[in-house]
Amino acid sequence: MSRHSQDERLGLPQPPALLPLLLLLLAVAVPLSQAGVYYATAYWMPTEKTIQVKNVLDRKGDAYGFYNNSVKTTGWGILEIKAGYGSQSLSNEIIMFAAGFLEGYLTAPHMDDHFTNLYPQLIKKRSMLNKVQDFLTKQDQWTRENIKYYKSDPFWRHADYVMAQMDGLFAGATKRAVLEGKKPMTLFQIQFLNAIGDLLDLIPSLSPTKNSSLKFFKRWDMGHCSALIKVLPGFENIFFAHSSWYTYAAMLRIYKHWDFNIVDKDTSSSRLSFSSYPGFLESLDDFYLLSSGLVLLQTTNSVYNKTLLQHVVPQSLLAWQRVRVASMMANNGKQWAEVFSKYNSGTYNNQYMVLDLKKVNLNHSLDEGTLYIVEQIPTYVEYSEQTAVLRRGYWPSYNIPFHEKVYNWSGYPILVKKLGLDYSYDLASRAKIFRRDQGKVTDMESMKYIMRYNNYKQDPYSKGDPCNTVCCREDLNSHSPSPGGCYDTKVADIYLASKYKAYAISGPTVQGGLPVFHWSRFNKTLHEGMPEAYNFDFITMKPIL
């Protein structure tokens, strides 16, 4: 780090002066009393090959942005970063490093909280920690070796951008911790956070059990979610939304807007807005609005055929890395699927919905290529063009594989035989609820409503179970309540997406008079940095820099 005058020495990020603060608050619609907006600019020092940070918003800097720490008042932090638009010309790798550095610097305290909260949810034994650490170390090494070896390959070049961003994230978080006299996070902890989704399959693959009971698994513990794409009858508009399900320990949230000036003939998207978490260089949910005109949604498919998990090896790219590379490179759904399919790790096995808004002609047609469905299991990725289904009105997604081969190989037919039709694609409770209620979606408010829907006491399809519905509340389970379920919803349409805008709400649903979730009922579950109660409204997410 180069030495500068006393005035320029790196301090902690400070709240901004009142005028820019007011401008920010006007743009993000947060009352002044709730403000905790911090901004900073990162400068690449080419001689020293380091980053210097100043607590100013300088458009000539190599990366600049702000973090609105409004988690306690809206349920969301908001991060916006622009990189590569400064006065000096930088390589794409340095731009990505600077962007990662600034994010780490601005959000390090919440990154630390998020790791604290999630670690005990995933790691129950020290022996498992060692196995996970060993796997992630080997996987990281394999990835970096390939990046070096295949320098001229566009795929690996983009993998390099993602890894440079992660290296920056680590360096920036370290800088902030040192300044505050705190113990910095390790690189493994950063890798662990980014691989949370992958760990949901990696951990079972590292600890094969002889007879895992099918009856007592929780619906939310594998990161299950609900998603819906809805087209109005005359193609007047297209809505899309996602509600995340996982442990409530993951409810420390950041909505992110990134705009990176990456100059590469093989890059289709370097600007994106997405729902995320502290320290994550991916959405995890997934809910992405990309500058290529693609929208990406995802729900998780459990793999009940445990023999498939034997094929998980570190010589592969994790799902979060492949999602980032595919989302940067692809200009359409088919390309996205092709890129994503490479070096499949068989971890975080999901259904991805890739919606191409460039193919949507409102009031006229949904052209071929509007919707691609991509599904992954270990050793296999299947994708298909499914616009014909969407033309009939909607595409629902609810944690059961669509493609027959993926469904069969994952072990669902056996599950249906043992546990009934709730695990079939056509007759799962959410399949029935979406089929019944999607026709009521006519505008943004009704789309929000269906995605927060939980009427488990009266709805015959829920059978009295607070998780047999669109927005699960396992904490309301009368037999064995636990702090998990559906804890957010993000909604947008074609008009909002063109401006990188969306509406987002954080916390378990209270629709129809359901009780507000309070952490006091589940104090043994770590929830550092979170509000005690979750009773927030939808807020508008939009970039303002």
Swiss-Prot record:
Q: Which GO terms describe its biological process?
A: phospholipid catabolic process
Q: Name one GO cellular component term.
A: extracellular region
- Disulfide bond residue pairs: 467-472, 471-486
Annotated propeptide span(s): 206-224
Entry's EC annotation: 3.1.1.-
Signal peptide boundaries? 1-35
Q: Where in the cell is it found?
A: Lysosome
Q: Which InterPro entries match?
A: PLipase_B-like (IPR007000), PLipase_B-like_dom1 (IPR043040), PLipase_B-like_dom2 (IPR043041), PLipase_B-like_dom3 (IPR043042)
- Keyword annotations from UniProtKB, A to Z: Disulfide bond, Glycoprotein, Hydrolase, Lipid degradation, Lipid metabolism, Lysosome, Signal
Q: Does the keyword Iron apply?
A: no
Residues carrying covalently attached carbohydrate according to the record: 68, 305, 363, 408, 523
Q: Where this protein primarily resides, as one coarse class? A: other
**Class of enzymatic activity (EC top level):** hydrolase
Entry PTM:
The maturation cleavages that produces chains A and B are required to open the putative substrate binding pocket. Both chains A and B remain associated in the mature protein.
Q: Which GO terms describe its molecular function?
A: phospholipase activity
The subunit field of the Swiss-Prot or TrEMBL record says:
May form a homodimer, each monomer is composed of a chain A and a chain B.
Role description: Exhibits a weak phospholipase activity, acting on various phospholipids, including phosphatidylcholine, phosphatidylinositol, phosphatidylethanolamine and lysophospholipids. However, in view of the small size of the putative binding pocket, it has been proposed that it may act rather as an amidase or a peptidase.
**UniProt family annotation:** Belongs to the phospholipase B-like family.
Protein name (database record): Phospholipase B-like 1
Question: Where does this protein come from, organism-wise?
Answer: Bos taurus (Bovine)
